[in-house]
Regions:
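Nucleotide-sugar donor-binding/catalytic module of glycosyltransferases
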Residues: 17-216
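Cysteine-centered motifs
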Residues: 7-10
Length: 216
């Protein structure tokens, strides 16, 4: 499966400055057998230009060296929080991360994804100026040539705002709801009791956002 490198539509967003009174973003990272890509993922998160973050890594009983990698990063950067649990699947791991999140905005990054350095700054800017309950942004495959045909037209949705859920959001905007390309208002997630469906390990984010969008 190709690695996904999450990006924002605004290429000059990396010029944004960190605001002293900025809103905290909670980034939830489920970890299982992730030793190959985990360091690159965490490097991309701690290197964000928006520094007011908490990076919640949920080690879902990973049998490889992921735990030691997480321990090293937590010792290096206090924003990295590690939660250990027995293996229960990616949905439960994300729910665990959401339950421990203290930020105003929730983001989901898989342990083989990376963010461009201004991704969180751009997400923060959109939430500050437009106050959405759910935000979908662009992504790209790394390397680009390995992107499956089914994914190519969904990589960069246009800049659009929906005041209420509409089927066009999914079927005309091609804003397919992969977890790694979406941010949520934490207040909205708590109010609507948004969770991933335990037991689902395939297309779990698709089911999750079919529950999210109608309430946003």
């Amino acid at each position: 499966m190709p690695r996904l490198r999450v990006c924002t539509a605004c290429r000059d967003a990396r010029r944004l400055f960190i605001r002293r009174n900025s809103v905290k973003i909670s980034i939830i990272v489920p970890v299982y057998k992730a030793e190959k890509h985990l360091a690159a993922t965490l490097d991309s998160l701690i290197g964000q230009t928006h520094a007011d973050l908490e990076i919640i890594c949920v080690n879902d009983g990973s049998p490889d060296t992921s735990a030691s990698i997480l321990e090293a990063y937590a010792a290096r950067d206090e924003r990295v929080r590690v939660i250990e649990q027995e293996n229960q699947g990616v949905s439960v791991a994300r729910n665990t991360g959401m339950a421990h999140a203290t930020g105003d905005i929730l983001m989901f990054v898989d342990a083989d994804d990376t963010l461009v350095d201004a991704a969180c700054a751009r997400v923060h800017e959109v939430f500050a100026t437009r106050q959405p309950e759910a935000l979908t942004f662009g992504l790209e495959c790394d390397p680009p040539e390995v992107a499956p045909a089914s994914l190519r037209r969904e990589l960069a949705p246009r800049d659009a705002v929906y005041d209420a859920f509409a089927p066009d959001l999914l079927f005309k905007e091609h804003a397919r709801p992969y977890a790694c390309r979406t941010a949520l208002s934490a207040d909205f997630a708590r109010r609507e009791r948004i969770m991933f469906e335990p037991g689902l390990g395939l297309a779990e984010d698709q089911v999750f956002y079919f529950a999210v969008y109608p309430f946003a």
